UniProtKB/Swiss-Prot annotation:
Its main location: cytoplasm. It comes from the Bacteria. It is found in: Cytoplasm. This is Bifunctional protein GlmU. It comes from Vibrio vulnificus (strain CMCP6). UDP-N-acetyl-alpha-D-glucosamine binds at residues 8-11, 22, 73, 78-79, 100-102, 137, 151, 166, 224, 330, 348, 363, 374. GO terms for molecular function: glucosamine-1-phosphate N-acetyltransferase activity; magnesium ion binding; UDP-N-acetylglucosamine diphosphorylase activity. Binds 1 Mg(2+) ion per subunit. In the N-terminal section; belongs to the N-acetylglucosamine-1-phosphate uridyltransferase family. In the C-terminal section; belongs to the transferase hexapeptide repeat family. Its EC number is 2.7.7.23, 2.3.1.157. The keyword Hydrolase does not apply. One of its GO terms (cellular component) is cytoplasm.
Amino acid sequence: MKFSAVILAAGKGTRMYSNMPKVLHTLAGKPMVKHVIDTCTGLGAQNIHLVYGHGGDQMQAALAEEPVNWVLQAEQLGTGHAVDQASPQFEDDEKILVLYGDVPLISSETIESLLDAQPKGGIALLTVVLDNPTGYGRIVRKNGPVVAIVEQKDANEEQKLIKEINTGVMVATGGDLKRWLAGLNNDNAQGEYYLTDVIAAAHDEGNAVEAVHPVSPIEVEGVNDRAQLARLERAFQAAQAKKLLEQGVMLRDPARFDLRGELQCGLDVEIDVNVIIEGNVSLGDNVVIGAGCVLKDCEIDDNTIVRPYSVIEGATVGEQCTVGPFTRLRPGAEMRNDSHVGNFVEVKNARIGEGSKANHLTYLGDAEIGQRTNIGAGTITCNYDGANKFKTIIGNDVFVGSDSQLVAPLTIADGATIGAGTTLTKDVAEGELVITRAKERKVTGWQRPVKKK
């Protein structure tokens, strides 16, 4: 189905009390307007015309990679004026879909229904019935068909009783829409060029206006303040949690789970409370994620346990591993099968071999660790000299004692032992014991100093 979209995103968002354009405020980890753009691209829009105004530099920086045509609305003179700024780029025979950057939850299913419903030469309009329609434009019908939309400030008392309201989302053919936009005037209570006036223009020409309802009313809720944004965030998260539960994922409390990206899960996955998923995350069968964890762009294989309050980003974790609690796996971290990292361990750009362990208070950066190696508490790979990074290579079956500093670059061969408290600066051969601990000294009868009175 050939169509192009116009996304209106020029408003400042005064009630957000922010220096950032309203549509750049995030929902589920990405700007509201990007949700709308992604929906359009997913449906195969030929062109996406993004009408912007306030905070143009911020908008273009934040959305620099998006496939949009930038259309400036220098003065905000109404929705009709906004769409008209993009109209020179409309093809006469293409469907034009009008959407809003601050209405982020509009679904593909609803848009497809709207595109299908557009009558030849007429308009398909998305409407919804509200118990309290105050503030919205009212849908005026005459013996059934839609004949006009009247904004709240221009409505008479009878029209204010109408509960069917305009969402602003509509579809019309490019040539018709350009003609109707050219005929708009600003003779109304707000002195603006209303897009809604094209409904009456279409009716006056004898063209049909078809009203369509969204799959869910939440889809057409807009955001004008942070309370409304928070409401949509919770609605979105509830929907994501419901889908995961239906797919067999055990969410211990669906109300305390946030998905800000894409999550793929195997069978019998358990996720405890206050877990945040960002980017693309993959969890294998029987994976258990403890409370308060943050997972971003990572892969965790079967039968692995991630204990509470661990942060995993850009890392891969093998099968039968244990992570945490309070572990940080940074980009480039790789845990092979049956490896363990424990509390207050940080791993960056390092591989931990099969069966190896670093259970306490350790930093492993720019390192390769072989199989069945034990890293004692307080071990640090000293990988940075203030200008360059250097690598530490540790072989199989190595024992590194507690409170050791491994000053890279260096290699520790298979089976070596590093005594506790060692500062290591040179390579260690296979099977060697290295210890640099200072000689122990005992002072008999030592008396601690006392405070002066």
